[in-house]
Amino acid sequence: MVSIRPDEISSIIRQQIEQYEQSINVDNVGTVLQVGDGIARVYGLDKVMASELVEFEDGTVGIALNLEEDNVGVVLMGAGLGIEEGSTVRATGKIASVPVGEAVIGRVVDALMRPIDGKGEIHATATRLLESPAPGIVQRKSVCEPLQTGITAIDAMIPIGRGQRELIIGDRQTGKTAVAIDTILNQKGQDVICVYVAIGQKASSVAQVVNVLRERGALDYTIVVAANASDPAALQYLAPYTGASIAEYFMYQGKHTLVIYDDLSKQAQAYRQMSLLLRRPPGREAYPGDVFYLHSRLLERAAKLNDALGGGSMTALPIVETQAGDVSAYIPTNVISITDGQIFLSSDLFNAGLRPAINAGISVSRVGSAAQIKAMKQVAGKLKLELAQFDELQAFAQFASDLDKATQNQLARGQRLREILKQPQYSPIPVEYQVATIYAGTNGYLDDIPVEAVAKFVAGLRDYLATSKPQYGEAVRSSQKLDETAEALLKEAIAEYKAGFTA
């Protein structure tokens, strides 16, 4: 008979007690009271945080936006067709965050960073909260480096610096997106990572933009975030913050980034829709009271960081659509007051054939001139003045029949200066050649060339400089000034090219 040894049994029991681990999973759950129009009212979820992600039984994710006494208002980030009254909701304990890293470059994603380009999963190295505090005053440095758009009218008269926020505003179909895409194309080889955020646009329009970027090799340094018109309002509301988070990740690594929000009017409309469905009180134009904060907290994240933080930058180009040129509407005035200047595109100029249709009179850049290169400063001052005088004289000349010779000369010069600012889409011009064409225009070298031949002349002059006088481009690029050597080369090139030019 086997003898039972109590000490052995007690040691085995003691061992098992020591190894026993009781784990209790406590889930914060609630019940759906009502669902519809992309909003769910949930009872329970006692300890839910503002903007916390919640998960429904069918896998749909939502954000808890309204925390009320007896229920929680949740915005759905999906169709939510499987959600019904009485179904269970689970709080995740997480605030919305997105995967970021080098792997996202060249991809097309939705507002939650899910790939929509058919190229498989994104293997990101880090995550970043959608809503991050903007850098403080001490962490910033004043804007001091130029961000060249490749558009002569902007780089000369409304210069943009790295870390600036410059609004692009205008009616529909005035070329706002074209200006933004040209700016992305011009960043090739400039070591700038671009993020294009498409909000509430047709999927076909976004596909067109992606194709242009791919064809011109710009997708190698660009990320496209798309919340299409068919997507839920919650995704259209979140998309700009996703774009800002991606750019912020690179900015804090000491890199330069450019973010385009196309456009914030549609984001404000999506937010208005959500707010009204959540029964928040409407204000002016039925927008909620915090619509200013919606845009200010987004745009304040754009910054030029100080050297201690790596000197990275995030430049924001928000786009806002106006109705019949009314810049005094609610959203346009809000965004104008938040940004560091605006580029106003006019439908009248667009229809008159002046493209890009930039109205230089009411467009301003409040901090960009500090970032403009010296060569451009040398020629742009005269251009601004002569164009302003031309606009004034043109209005006056409509009523006067006989004009003196000086006035006629000034009008003729103004017409030629307008011609050099015209530029086809998707053809950004390097800054040294912009300087050359403005120099030729403001110093009278185009005065004897017919107005209709000016575009052909300046395009030919740029090619001639690139092929026959490459040392001019090198001199301006290296010194960033139009010094005596560069000016002599330029004068020589203009004279040589003009001698062989036929209109």
UniProtKB/Swiss-Prot annotation:
The keyword Transport is annotated on this UniProt entry: yes
Residues reported in the UniProt entry to bind ATP: D171, R172, Q173, T174, G175, K176, T177, A178
Record's subunit section: F-type ATPases have 2 components, CF(1) - the catalytic core - and CF(0) - the membrane proton channel. CF(1) has five subunits: alpha(3), beta(3), gamma(1), delta(1), epsilon(1). CF(0) has four main subunits: a(1), b(1), b'(1) and c(9-12).
Protein origin, superkingdom: Bacteria
Example GO molecular function: proton-transporting ATP synthase activity, rotational mechanism
Major subcellular site: membrane
PROSITE patterns reported in the protein's UniProt record: ATPASE_ALPHA_BETA (PS00152)
EC number: 7.1.2.2
Record's catalysed reaction(s): ATP + H2O + 4 H(+)(in) = ADP + phosphate + 5 H(+)(out)
Family the entry assigns: Belongs to the ATPase alpha/beta chains family.
Membrane topology category: Peripheral membrane protein
Upper classification of the organism: Bacteria, Bacillati, Cyanobacteriota, Cyanophyceae, Synechococcales
Organism: Synechococcus sp. (strain PCC 6716)
Residues annotated as site: Required for activity: V364
The keyword Glycoprotein is annotated on this UniProt entry: no
CDD domains named among the record's database cross-references: ATP-synt_F1_alpha_C, ATP-synt_F1_alpha_N, F1-ATPase_alpha_CD
Keywords from the UniProt entry: ATP synthesis, ATP-binding, CF(1), Hydrogen ion transport, Ion transport, Membrane, Nucleotide-binding, Thylakoid, Translocase, Transport
One GO cellular component, as annotated: proton-transporting ATP synthase complex
Designated name of the protein: ATP synthase subunit alpha
NCBIfam families linked: atpA, PRK13343.1
